[in-house]
A protein has these predicted regions:
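Active-site beta-alpha connecting loops in nucleotide-dependent enzymes
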Residues: 33-38, 327-330, 346-419
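Non-catalytic positions within long, well-ordered alpha-helices that form the structural scaffold/packing
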Residues: 44, 48-49, 170-171, 362, ...
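Phosphate-binding loop of NTP-binding sites
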Residues: 79-219, 223-232, 242-252, 308, ...
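Residue-level signal for inorganic ion chemistry
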Residues: 28, 47, 84, 104, ...
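Short, basic phosphate-binding NTP loop
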Residues: 2-103, 112-123, 145, 414, ...
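Generic hydrophobic/aromatic pocket-lining and core-packing "Φ" positions
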Residues: 44, 166, 201, 205, ...
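ATP-dependent carboxylate/acyl-activation modules
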Residues: 104, 110, 329-332, 451, ...
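Acidic, Mg2+-coordinating active-site environments of NTP-dependent enzymes
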Residues: 61-67, 97, 179-341, 366-367, ...
Length: 461
């Protein structure tokens, strides 16, 4: 049994919380987490030597019997970390005020949308947000535990690979508001089917509906609209009546705030060599300029604007904030090298994000185009079908260069062979080929699942 009051009082003495003994700077509360291939309990005493104030360990670990008063024994360190985070989320302010938390999930665009929302809300508020994509059962509690007395709003990203992941994370984060960016065919190995994806992501809506929370819903998306309608009573008007203000619609148990390109009457402008990034025109002649590659990011931008408007950020302020966001970590980045223009989206890939990236490549104005694509992982029995769909799409585009990497694309090529496609077993093999066969004067999409590491090819482009 975890004595959460005692644990919380000790946490309040610490500078921060960490699960990485290598990150100890002094004064932290260290949690020794145990996974399939590691055991952080083994580093607990070392963490104390390095300056951690306390170390939380499993009660059956060697460190638990060390006799060091700074060692706190619990039945399960991960459960303790999550319980501490939930308690901190509920007791952030000594005067009893409740911190407003915005929860975010979705198949694609979670991290980009989270960063855009944070940038927009920071115009008016002190915002604590998930760092990077620390959105799992460890990252979410660590994000919550970084909240301090100065925090006015928290934006928490939640990821999922398995059916009940979101249900567990909302119990820790207890969001007051929620937004699902989209639902797509990803992690099918864990979810079983697209319906499984919708059920899993919809657990955010389930929590909000059960706790009188508020959902931001992109009503341009039929899947999200249907998922919201299953939980709240609201209708989508055929003709949007309010072009620039998200319209709250009282549901059975909580409000729904609608947004979308059509509701905002936002128009995505064509890209060009002079304007390669996403741009949108809003009513009244307002221009939204971004540093994001890909028209598919338009819904992420509109989501951030909608959230900002609801929390009192003006439209002009929101547009300015969006324009300052520069993506990183190979997410929707566009870079001009000495030889090529690169659309770097190599952080991850699934069927829906791959199709969207290829659709965007069609819209890009360029004389010569290419695509370097890596396998999409965790698709289970649907893998060959989904890779064949991507292969068919890319072959229909008439690209000047198509390079595919991985065993799943090899299986697709066995079904539909093409002499115009170059296949490689690994990103290292493709990198070696690019070094021996330099490519220049081309706009190139680089995308694949994280494990394929397509970013290794970038230095040769």
């Amino acid at each position: 049994m975890i004595d959460i009051q005692r644990l919380y009082s000790l946490f309040k003495e610490c500078s921060s919380v960490t699960t990485d003994s290598r990150a100890i700077a002094g004064g932290e509360m260290f949690f020794g987490l145990k996974g399939e291939n590691f055991d952080g309990n083994e580093y607990a005493l070392k963490a104390l030597e390095l300056g951690a104030k306390y170390a939380v360990v499993n009660e059956d670990s060697v460190a638990a019997s060390s006799g060091d008063e700074r060692v706190i024994s619990v039945p399960d360190t991960l459960e303790a970390l999550q319980a501490l985070a939930r308690h901190h989320r509920e007791n952030t302010f000594v005067d009893g005020r409740r911190l407003t938390v915005i929860g975010l999930t979705g198949t694609n665009g979670k991290t980009t949308t989270k960063e855009l929302i944070t940038r927009v809300l920071s115009v008016r508020y002190n915002v604590t947000a998930t760092k990077g994509n620390l959105n799992n059962d460890i990252g979410v509690p660590l994000s919550l535990l970084s909240i301090n007395d100065a925090t006015q709003l928290a934006v928490i990203e939640m990821g999922a690979n398995h059916p009940d992941d979101i249900a567990k994370l909302v119990k820790v984060s207890e969001p007051d508001y929620g937004l699902i960016t989209n639902v797509g065919r990803a992690h099918l190995l864990g979810f079983g089917s697209f319906e499984g994806v919708k059920r899993a992501k919809g657990q955010l809506y389930d929590y909000l509906a059960a706790h009188s929370g508020t959902a931001f819903v992109n009503t341009d998306d039929p899947d999200l609209t249907a998922m919201a309608a299953d939980r709240w009573s609201f209708t989508v008007p055929a003709i949007p009546a309010v072009p620039l203000v998200p319209e709250p619609v009282e549901g059975v148990e909580g409000p729904v705030i609608r947004y979308g390109l059509s509701l905002f009457k936002a128009k995505v402008l064509p890209s060009s060599s002079e304007h390669p990034y996403l741009r949108m025109k809003m009513p009244g002649g307002l221009l939204v300029e971004t540093h994001l590659a890909g028209a598919y990011n338009a819904t992420n931008v509109v989501a951030a604007i909608a959230v900002g408007l609801h929390f009192g950020v003006s439209l002009e302020e929101a547009i300015d904030a969006v324009s300052t966001y520069i993506p990183k970590n190979n997410r929707s980045q566009m870079e001009k090298t000495e030889r090529n223009v690169l659309i770097q989206d190599a952080y991850n890939a699934n069927p829906s994000s791959m199709a969207a990236a290829l659709d965007n490549l069609v819209l890009v104005k360029a004389e010569r185009k290419g695509a370097l694509l890596g396998d999409m992982r965790e698709l289970g029995e649907e893998s060959q079908t989904e890779h064949l769909k991507v292969l068919n799409q890319v072959l229909s585009m008439g690209l000047d260069l198509v390079c595919l990497v991985g065993e799943e694309f090899a299986k697709a090529l066995a079904v539909r062979h093409s002499d115009s496609v170059k296949w490689f077993a690994s990103s290292e093999d493709l990198t070696a080929w690019l070094k021996a066969n330099p490519v220049s004067g081309m706009t190139i999409l680089v995308k694949g699942s994280r494990g394929i590491q397509m970013e290794k090819t970038l230095p040769e482009l």
